[in-house]
């Protein structure tokens, strides 16, 4: 990240010249939840342990996985793949940000296909920028302040998708209990879709069903839809699109990532489905995986193609609600089901308004969801900019751009004995005096 023209008083050195590098010696399972010392592994969170091997100020770099970076001062212990990086005569806070700013360079040659990992040379051999001690302190302080603001902004932005998820469920709740179209209904008198009182449900699983408008009816699922099982051999349809549960995003109704039968290499029997049908995953119904097909294809036998007798989009939206998903997930007991069979699905109640009101509900829901989708897209774009901002600020810091004015105002703090060149000589002397030994270890 320090590539490009640096301030004339800065030095370019290999990181290994500025640090003592070692690793922990323990397995990750050495952690003790009641331990009194921090135990740094390759996980994002810090564990605890009852013994310590280091008593120093250091930066901890996970040697595999997410390559997380932390800093700590005091007694601690470390996992055998965690790198303990101790600064030699430079500020620990500065070293922390230096590693954050160069982590891409450190990990770009990461080895391992399943879990990437790095070696010591990936750390020690990279070139980094070295400013004077005073400027190191200032850079670390500026980065602490600026990136704390960035992280705060990022945290607030990351909360918005969950808020929007709750908003969508609230919209569906109001849609399916009649509140969303209450005023519309007062101005549009429509007869019930199923006028026969004997066909309307009053209870479900020995409990009274929620209240709905007078001209609505609670109907069994099999009264408003048919499950269209049509198993066929996929070998006869190699170029047909194959839809599986993993292609449907939970709670959104969005499908993506699907391929052809041939590309997926499937051989077992599949259901044939058609454009406009509802496709519902019966596996782990609590995941709420349902979509409306926008193409003809074949789907997993673990999915139900459904023909709706009412407005398809209305039934689809009902199947995305918390209420439907709770009923589908628990059947006759409180035990979460691994799958829902046709009998249990057929018995689930569906609140059924007159057809014109179904259309109006669908229109309003889609309008509100489109509004939420627009906000979510804006949030995702903002998050991308925030993530880029972090890297941009780090790049500016290690090109000397954040402290340019300070250098102009404080030439005495970057020259002579206070210079980066003088510091580098002191570091070399310190390394020579210690004989290049690694960090001292103690055990308690």
Swiss-Prot record:
Sorted UniProt keywords: DNA-binding, Restriction system
Annotated InterPro entries: Restrct_endonuc_typeI_TRD, Restrct_endonuc_typeI_TRD_sf, Type-I_RE_S_subunit
A molecular-function term among this protein's GO annotations: DNA binding
Domain of life: Bacteria
Keyword Nucleotide-binding annotated: no
GO BP terms, alphabetized: DNA restriction-modification system
Paired cysteines (S-S): none
Subunit structure: The type I restriction/modification system is composed of three polypeptides R, M and S; the restriction enzyme has stoichiometry R(2)M(2)S(1) while the methyltransferase is M(2)S(1).
Functional description taken from the UniProt entry: The specificity (S) subunit of a type I restriction enzyme; this subunit dictates DNA sequence specificity. The M and S subunits together form a methyltransferase (MTase) that methylates two adenine residues of the sequence 5'-TTAN(7)GTCY-3'. In the presence of the R subunit the complex can also act as an endonuclease, binding to the same target sequence but cutting the DNA some distance from this site. Whether the DNA is cut or modified depends on the methylation state of the target sequence. When the target site is unmodified, the DNA is cut.
Additional comment: Type I restriction and modification enzymes are complex, multifunctional systems which require ATP, S-adenosyl methionine and Mg(2+) as cofactors and, in addition to their endonucleolytic and methylase activities, are potent DNA-dependent ATPases.
Domain characteristics, as noted in the entry: Contains two DNA recognition domains, each specifying recognition of one of the two defined components of the target sequence.
Similarity-based family: Belongs to the type-I restriction system S methylase family.
Name the record gives this protein: Type I restriction enzyme EcoDI specificity subunit
């Amino acid at each position: 990240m320090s590539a490009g023209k640096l301030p004339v008083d800065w030095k370019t050195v290999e990181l290994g010249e500025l640090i003592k590098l070692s690793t922990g010696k323990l397995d990750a399972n050495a952690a003790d939840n009641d331990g009194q010392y921090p135990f740094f592994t390759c996980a994002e969170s810090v564990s605890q342990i009852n013994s310590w091997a280091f008593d120093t100020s250091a930066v901890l770099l996970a040697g595999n996985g997410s390559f997380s970076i932390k800093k700590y001062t005091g007694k601690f212990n470390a996992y055998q793949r965690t790198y303990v990086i101790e600064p030699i005569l430079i500020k620990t806070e500065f070293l922390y940000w230096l590693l954050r700013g160069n982590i891409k360079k450190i990990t770009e040659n990461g080895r391992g296909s399943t879990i990437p990992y790095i070696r010591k040379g990936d750390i020690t051999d990279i070139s980094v920028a070295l400013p004077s001690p005073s400027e190191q302190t200032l850079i670390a302080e500026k980065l602490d302040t600026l990136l704390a603001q960035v992280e705060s902004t990022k945290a607030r932005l990351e909360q918005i998708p969950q808020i929007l998820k709750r908003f969508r469920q609230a919209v569906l709740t109001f849609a399916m209990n009649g509140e969303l179209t209450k005023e519309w209904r007062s101005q549009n008198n429509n007869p019930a879709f199923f006028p026969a009182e004997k066909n309307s449900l009053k209870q479900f699983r020995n409990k009274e069903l929620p209240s709905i408008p007078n001209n609505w009816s609670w109907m069994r699922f099999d009264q408003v839809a048919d499950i269209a099982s049509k198993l066929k051999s996929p070998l006869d349809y190699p170029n047909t699109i194959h839809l599986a549960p993993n292609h449907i995003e939970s709670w959104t109704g969005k499908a993506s990532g699907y391929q052809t039968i041939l590309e997926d290499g499937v051989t077992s029997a599949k259901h044939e489905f058609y454009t406009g049908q509802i496709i519902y995953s019966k596996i782990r119904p609590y995941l709420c995986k349902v979509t409306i097909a926008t193409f003809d294809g074949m789907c997993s036998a673990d999915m139900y193609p459904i023909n709706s007798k009412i407005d398809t989009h209305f039934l689809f939206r009902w199947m995305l609600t918390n209420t439907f998903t709770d009923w589908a997930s628990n059947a006759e007991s409180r035990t979460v089901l691994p799958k829902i069979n046709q009998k249990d699905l057929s018995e689930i109640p569906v609140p059924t308004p007159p057809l014109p009101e179904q259309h109006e509900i669908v229109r309003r829901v889609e309008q509100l969801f489109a509004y939420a989708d627009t906000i979510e897209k804006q949030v995702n774009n903002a998050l991308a900019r925030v993530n880029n901002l972090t890297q941009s600020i780090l790049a500016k810091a290690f090109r000397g751009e954040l402290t340019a004015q300070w250098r102009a105002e404080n030439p005495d703090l970057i020259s002579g004995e206070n210079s980066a060149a003088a510091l580098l000589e002191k570091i070399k002397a310190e390394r020579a005096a210690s004989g290049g030994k690694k960090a001292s270890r103690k055990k308690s």
